[in-house]
Amino acid sequence: MLHDVVAAIAAWPRRPACSLVTSDPFALELARQYDFEIIPDPANPGETGAIEMATNVCVERGIDYTLVIPADIPLIHASELDQIFAHAPEQGSVLAPAADGRGTNAAFRRPVNLFPLRFGNDSFKPHLAAAQSTGKPCIVLQLPGIALDVDNPENLHQLLSHSGETRTQSLLRRWSLSGLVVTGTEGA
């Protein structure tokens, strides 16, 4: 999935400077292959800790905005990134929820530390509340490619039902997951 996300962002004609927070060898190679800056996370602080670390790096460098994209949204498309930037306020945020409305699958903030990001189960409502509490505009966009994150077996079936041939879809089809039994779901 990470490969699909990084490749989609790299192919985006309006791509700004991009960073990948990781110390994973496979992810490091992808970052190099697609010319992403690497922000090492040797302590592996988890998603929220990695984003806080990257936010601090951006503040130190005087970066104007951040767009945080997770690695588990293989259907992301450049047109959706265009929509985020088209709606981005001069000061404020844009949030794109997961399809179930519980998780946050894209978070644009200007300035970069406008409000803290806290990922995990049910992150969307807290992110929306934090964004609104700043008094700055907060735009919520429903973006179908970004909305489908893969958190559980049911999401794999949803991914397979979409047209297209991302690397992830191709791999799932090779694995022939049509017989996979879905017994429950986890949080986004």
What role is predicted for each listed range?
Residues 1-15:
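A short, N-terminal amphipathic alpha-helix
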Residues 76-101:
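Conserved donor-nucleotide/metal-binding helix-loop-beta segment in metal-dependent transferases, i.e.
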Residues 129-188:
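Conserved alpha/beta core of the MobA/IspD/sugar-nucleotide pyrophosphorylase nucleotidyltransferase superfamily
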